Amino acid sequence: MPRKREVPVRPVLPDARYNSKLVSMFIHKLMRDGKKSTAESILYKAFDIINEKTGKAPLEVFEEALANVKPKLEVKSRRVGGSTYQVPTEIREARRLALAIRWMIGYARSRAEKGMDVKLAGELMDAAGQRGASVKKREDTHKMAEANKAFAHYRW
């Protein structure tokens, strides 16, 4: 590992329609092969679908969904004397957000509906309602941490 100074975190510019940094981060993760305009149109169409189906502000549903998917704990492998333990550790806020966004996009892509905008809208609405695959992933992560609570003293 290089012993140089810490790399500064690049600022995220807010998106054009909602003026939100969260939406901008989501668009960047959703983007494939540098096609940002395609990613933007997918997310904005998903927001239109959410507005149509729920009648709520799509940004509120989006933020609620992210809050419901963000994990608080995760397990990290730690090798102690020949055996590997799954040690539960708390997650810092930036990683919580990154994991939540990654999980939501991943599970939206694997949904059965037709069209990414419909898939993403469905996953966002499910996550906002405390159901869906991404919320289950968070629950599974927390269960793993709870099951390995005995190894918490191996934290570093």
Curated annotation (Swiss-Prot):
Transmembrane segments: none annotated. Gene3D superfamilies: Ribosomal protein S7 domain (1.10.455.10). Keywords: Ribonucleoprotein, Ribosomal protein, RNA-binding, rRNA-binding, tRNA-binding. One of its GO terms (biological process) is translation. GO terms for cellular component: small ribosomal subunit. It holds the Pfam family Ribosomal_S7. One of its GO terms (molecular function) is rRNA binding. SUPFAM superfamilies: Ribosomal protein S7. NCBIfam families: rpsG_bact. HAMAP family: Ribosomal_uS7_B (MF_00480_B). One of the primary rRNA binding proteins, it binds directly to 16S rRNA where it nucleates assembly of the head domain of the 30S subunit. Is located at the subunit interface close to the decoding center, probably blocks exit of the E-site tRNA. Part of the 30S ribosomal subunit. Contacts proteins S9 and S11. PANTHER family: RIBOSOMAL PROTEIN S7. Belongs to the universal ribosomal protein uS7 family. This is Small ribosomal subunit protein uS7. The gene is rpsG.
